Amino acid sequence: MLDFQLSPRQLKLQKKAREFALKEILPVAWYYDEIDETPLNLLKKAHAAGLINGDIPKKYGGKGWGLIESVLLTEELAAACPGLATTIFDNSLGMEPLVLSKNEPLKKKYFSKILKDFKLICFATSEPTMGSDVAAIRCKAERDGNDYILNGTKYWITNGGIADYMSVFATVDPDSQHEGVCAFLVEKDWKGVSIGRKIPKMGQRGSNTTGINFKDVKVPKENILAPPGEGFMLAMQTFSRTRPAIGAFAVGTARSAMEYAIDYAKKRRAFGTEIANFQAIQHKIAEMYQKVETSRLLVWKAAWEADQGMDPTITASIAKFYSTEACLEIANEALQIFAGYGYTKMFPIEKLLRDARLFRIYEGTSEVQRYIVSGYAMNVYQPVMPPLEDLPIHREMDPTELEGKEGQTAWRCRICGYVHYGETPPEECPYCFFPESAFKEAP
């Protein structure tokens, strides 16, 4: 039985997140985008309000949120500012490898630290020449007894300049692809860790993005998140559980753009009436609303699958690329409704459009998601319909054409579908001219 009714706990969290977004994030969103800074005081407020670290399991003292709670929270925060919401959410991304890790002592040690004080943790996989291709990691982890020595550079790291801890993915052998990938929990203050300059971005400027360099950084065996051979799977499992939240970012951003466009269309007059009365505008609004709703349903389904212990990989990929592309389309159409004013910084649409563009890139590009989904559809998905060459003949032929042919063998051309009756197939198909070898006995 399907049930889309949120629980009282979930509704309470949704309301709390919405109130925080409208009161604390929305009034400062434009300012921090303009100055390209991340407000630590805002993050501390979110932490104090219980909107950060909610996904730490209850057995370690956390709230034990499921993914449904995470996507509800993310949508509301992103509606106010995608960039600042990214900064808040990325703590969950950085923490997910620790949640999924098999290293129990490490979990107990760092979860207690994160819950006790205001601590941030970032996710460090991407490199200057590597993004979605996690198996191509070049950051080297060399064995030093039972410990490891890290050398290399990470790039595009959200919260890289402000995080206290880092979930770092490296490899013991760059040529071994996914088999050499491993992961470690690294502290910012360890010797050899240095933070690069903040990367200037087109959008989501309220989120801190930097490079991180590791030079002979010694990582004790106690801080291994995943040993060599298990790091790649840990990264994939992390993405499967966090991609629904990227979809939720897109839903929140798209929802805001749509709401602003509706409000403007009801007030802007042209040719003697509000532009909301024009069918062209109404059709744009209808398509916006349709895409927001379908995106949210996909995001919720992916989150629900994860919460049920199912593998959400495919649904998460679908939700990620559908919702993020829909978001960009909605923001673009919203700007069109605003016309010239949408292109100015006096209204929020231009910022939402800049912010929305990033969703199609991070945590796996749209192209990578399509590759994942197409591979599943063509190689794993089990079709219900029979192959074309095995379709029942009587379903596709005029019954009158079957008269007098009872008992004869039916031969179907696998190229064009033509059916021939006789003891043997024809030497050549009269339609597509393929030879006898193209024919197969039909059921």
Give the positions of each predicted feature.
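Alpha-helical interface subdomain recognition
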Residues: 1-80, 84, 89-91, 101-106, ...
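Flexible, small-/acidic-enriched active-site or ligand-binding loops
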Residues: 136-138, 191-220
